[in-house]
Amino acid sequence: MANDQMAAQMSGKGGFIAALDQSGGSTPGALRLYGIAESAYSGEAEMFRLMHEMRVRMITSPAFNGDKVIAAILFERTMDGLAQGKPVPTFLWEERGVVPFLKVDKGLEAEADGVSLMKPMPDLDPLLARAAKLGVYGTKMRSVINLASKTGVAAIARQQFEIGEQIARHGLMPILEPEVSIKSPDKAGAEALLLAELTKGLDALPADRQVMFKLTLPETPDFYAPLIKDKRVARVVALSGGYTRADACKRLAANHGMIASFSRALAQDLRQSMSDAEFNVALASAIDEIYRASVVKV
């Protein structure tokens, strides 16, 4: 069964997760980095069409395959789109051996108590049902911790686990992403609070339940080792969080058992104006660098 193969790949295979899940708010910045100015398109539909073209260019590139990229996180519109005539999740798994995940959050609430919780997701159940039908294996949702606030961090963890439970009821694997901002004045303090709260959340899980975590690269290497070793955790992946690719990869290589789930760091050298040959070389080089940091540790 495809799901069993996907589960085995997610918990054990060497490689990393490509985060291709820019949403409306972050799309103009991603397109700008790719070399498309905001003046080059008008309206949301055109913006998302250009973004989809970029995503399809990435996932159909020869280097983008399950040898090094074990999974990809998609934005809803990408999940609903086509690549080489097939639904994107089907294309990823059948043609590339890449496990599809879906970003499900609707963005962040305003900061309160040092954190930004996720906005309500009133349409989550129908979205999850649709994703499961399209062959998506799991989900990802992000909230942000700016300060080492005990009550704030507890609220972040609680919300992630509660919605994670709703996702699991659809037979999907939730990636919980409580991001600690790399600009936090007490990043290490926030990470200590987060580790304690995530451990608490794991202790409350039903016996057969597993989750994944997507976490900021910690100040202390191997800080999240207890989570990585926990049987209730299928995988712990790292976000690049604004670090350059070189810096993110250097930090990642010092964290044993943690693999990358990079977005900007994966696409930072890609440009629309490149020939396909140039594009493929640039993407292959980024994939190689991130793969190495995910599997070769110092």
Label the model's feature ranges.
Residues 144-147, 152-166, 172:
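Internal active-site segments that recognize and position negatively charged phosphoryl groups
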Residues 153-163, 190-200, 228-235:
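Short, electropositive alpha-helical surface patch
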